[in-house]
Amino acid sequence: MADVQFRWRRAEEEASEAPALFDADQLLDRHVGRGEFSGMEFLHVNARRIINQVPSASRVPFRWTINAYRGCSHACSFCFARPTHEYLGLGIGEDFERRIVVKVNAVERVAAEVAARRWSGDHIAMGTNTDPYQRCEGKYHLTRGIVRVLGAAKNPFSILTKSTLILRDLDVLSEAARHAEVRCNFSIGTLDQDVWKLTEPGTPHPRHRVEAVRRLNDAGIPCGVLVAPVLPGLSDGDEQLEEVVTACVEAGATSVSAIALHLRPGVRDHFLASLRVTRPDLARDYERRYRRAYLPATEQ
């Protein structure tokens, strides 16, 4: 525990270098998961701030984000956010999947920050680093509380998730949508069961996610789909892509767009190590094609 505490303090000192990541000023305690959370550990922190500004150089279509958790039990082998755990002295592998940082004061911080005079009321994106509806949200209810606060403040927001747990919050999402623009997007990279089990072992079945898209739209919450990431040699077949796009359109998705896999430093090594075990026939091809984070332009 001492090493984690030390690295946490170091992260505070480096906050100015990456403001979207370092937002905790006190590591309070840790809780070992039991029952359905067996094998997990939750690091409770008080966040110094919770609404973070996206760096100006970023190409994403939003300026502000909220992430109530760090780390993610969805355990997607390609997750670009894995290296954020290294700043706390934790690993990008099992630590990222099993040692989850919980910003226990997130709801209170959102309430204070959206009430501040300097806050502009801009759109806020949730789910940009880790899933706001990952398993531990069922325990902590932080995302539910944040949705309530943003709705009451008439502040527009969007949610990106892979989790059907979002359906638990149809009531507060519908109430928020009465006062502000609310949008949701599901990430559904494939309907291929083998690929899903291989690359997203902690996520709900993709067919259940498609049904969640239907239920959100039926409830009046606009919900689109990101077919992401598209994995070369795994989920990029014409029939595979047609299957997932057709299912999402039939479910009433407001939009369907695809994003190709990219592998940042650190994530690349983690993903390739997994691939060498599960699909050694593809590992060498990925090593060649992903010498950099993105596929060559000629292959996209």
Predicted segments with their positions:
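Conserved Radical SAM active-site core
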Residues: 33-70, 77-185, 189-197, 206-215
